[in-house]
C-alpha cells in the first residue's frame, strides 16, 4: 500500500535528547494480543492444528477440573466468558503488610531467581505456575455478558508451544521473519541498545525504576517478558507490514503467509449482539458510534477491526478503504496517570483527519 502520512513527533523523554523516528521501537502493550497471540493462533488454524470450538482443557489439561476447562477457546477470543478483566499479579508477591513474600523475589540473579524484572530484582523461576494457578482459581464477573479480559492471553504461549512443538517466541518469530521484520520482538534489549527503544514509565510501586527496553505490563514482566497479553515491541512501519499482509489476503511479496479465509474469519464480526461487536481477538466497530467509547474514527466501516494498547498504542485496519492506521506513543511516561492522550482524543482525531483527506 501507499503511505498517506508517516510522521514522527517529539522525543523519547522530556530531556529532548533523542528524537522519535520511524525506527523508534515501542512497547506496543495489548497490541501483543492481536499481533502475536491471535496471529499465532491464525497460523495454527491455517495448519489445522488449532480448533476454535475445542474447550480450553483440550489444549491445557491442567484446566480440566476447573470451571474454565469446558469453555470453548473461541469464547475467550470473543471476550464473552465473563471472566474478570485482569489480575494484578505483582501484588501476589506481597504480604498483607506490603512487603515481598519470602522465596518469591531476590535482588540478585541466581538459578533459582532467574526471571529478570530489573537489574536488581529477580523473580522465582517457577512463578509462572503461580500465575496459572491464579487464573485457574479466579472468578467470573458475569457469564452472560461480554467483558474484555486479558487472562486467556497469558495461556496462549503454552497453547502455541504445545501445538507447534516450538517456543511461542520462536513460532511467532518465524512469522515475523517470513515478513522480513527485525524490530518486532520480545525482550528487545537482547538485540538493540536502549537508545533505539522508547521508555515507558518511571515505576514507583513495583520495580522502582524507569521501565526501558523491558515490558511495561507487570504480569508480562513476571512471565520473563514473553507473554500473550503484552510484551511485544515494534515500530509503526513493521506493524504496517503485518496488517498490509491482512489487506493483501494473506500475501507478502508474493509469498502466502495466511489463508485469506482465515483472515476473513478472525476479523469479521463473530459476536454481534446488542452493543457488543467482536472479532476473534480483534475489536470491531460498535453498532452506534460514541466518541466517549471509541478510539477509532467515526468514518470507519463495519468491516474494520483493530486493537488498542495501554501504553498509548493503536492499530485499526479498514478493508473497505484499504486503510491501515497505526499510532504509537509512550503515553504512560513518566507515569500512567498521564491521561492527556485520552483527554484530547488525539488518536481518534488523527484517524478522522486521515479519512477526511480522501473522503472529501
Predicted regions mapped to residue ranges:
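Structured C-terminal helix/loop/strand segments within mature extracytoplasmic catalytic/sensor domains
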Residues: 307-360
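Extracellular/periplasmic catalytic domains that process cell-envelope and extracellular macromolecules
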Residues: 19, 66-70, 140, 273-275, ...
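Short active-site loop at a secondary-structure junction
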Residues: 15-76, 138-152, 227-230
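Short, surface-exposed loop or secondary-structure junction motifs
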Residues: 68-302
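Short, conserved catalytic-motif segment at the N-terminal edge
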Residues: 1-28, 49-51, 210, 217, ...
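Residue-level preference for non-acidic, small/hydrophobic
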Residues: 1, 33, 37, 41, ...
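A short, well-structured edge-of-sheet supersecondary motif
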Residues: 1-19, 117-125, 182-184, 315-318, ...
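Active-site-proximal beta-strand/loop segments in catalytic clefts of secreted hydrolases
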Residues: 1, 9, 79-81, 283-285, ...
Amino acid at each position: 500500500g501507499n503511505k498517506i502520512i508517516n510522521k514522527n513527533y517529539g522525543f523519547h523523554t522530556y530531556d529532548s535528547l533523542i528524537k522519535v523516528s520511524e525506527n523508534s521501537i515501542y512497547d506496543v502493550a495489548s497490541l501483543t494480543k492481536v499481533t502475536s497471540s491471535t496471529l499465532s493462533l491464525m497460523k495454527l488454524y491455517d495448519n489445522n492444528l488449532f480448533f476454535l470450538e475445542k474447550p480450553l482443557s483440550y489444549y491445557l489439561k491442567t484446566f480440566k477440573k476447573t470451571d474454565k476447562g469446558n469453555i470453548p477457546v473461541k469464547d475467550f477470543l470473543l471476550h464473552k466468558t465473563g471472566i474478570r478483566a485482569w489480575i494484578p499479579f505483582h501484588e501476589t508477591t506481597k504480604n498483607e503488610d506490603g512487603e515481598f513474600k519470602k522465596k518469591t523475589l531476590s535482588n540478585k540473579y541466581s538459578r533459582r531467581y532467574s526471571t529478570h524484572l530489573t537489574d536488581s530484582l529477580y523473580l522465582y523461576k517457577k512463578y509462572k505456575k503461580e500465575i496459572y494457578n491464579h487464573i485457574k482459581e479466579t472468578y467470573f464477573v458475569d457469564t452472560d455478558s461480554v467483558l474484555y479480559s486479558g487472562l486467556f492471553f497469558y495461556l496462549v504461549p503454552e497453547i502455541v508451544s504445545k501445538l507447534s512443538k516450538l517456543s511461542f517466541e520462536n513460532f511467532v518469530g518465524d512469522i515475523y521473519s517470513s515478513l522480513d521484520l527485525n524490530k518486532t520482538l520480545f525482550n528487545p534489549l537482547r538485540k538493540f541498545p536502549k537508545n533505539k527503544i522508547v521508555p515507558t514509565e518511571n515505576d514507583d510501586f513495583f520495580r522502582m525504576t524507569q521501565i526501558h527496553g523491558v515490558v511495561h505490563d507487570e504480569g508480562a514482566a513476571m512471565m520473563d517478558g514473553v507473554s500473550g497479553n503484552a510484551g511485544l515491541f515494534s515500530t509503526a512501519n513493521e506493524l504496517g507490514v503485518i496488517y498490509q499482509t491482512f489487506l493483501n489476503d494473506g500475501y507478502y511479496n508474493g509469498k502466502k503467509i495466511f489463508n485469506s479465509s482465515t483472515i476473513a474469519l478472525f476479523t469479521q464480526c463473530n459476536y454481534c449482539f446488542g452493543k457488543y461487536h467482536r472479532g476473534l481477538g480483534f475489536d470491531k466497530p460498535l453498532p452506534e458510534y460514541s466518541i466517549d467509547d471509541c478510539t477509532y474514527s467515526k468514518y470507519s466501516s463495519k468491516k474494520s477491526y483493530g486493537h488498542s494498547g495501554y501504553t498509548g498504542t493503536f492499530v485499526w485496519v479498514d478493508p473497505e478503504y484499504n486503510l491501515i492506521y497505526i499510532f504509537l506513543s509512550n503515553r504512560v511516561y513518566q507515569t500512567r496517570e498521564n491521561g492527556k492522550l485520552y483527554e484530547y482524543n488525539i488518536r481518534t482525531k488523527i484517524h478522522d483527519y486521515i479519512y477526511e483527506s480522501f473522503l472529501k
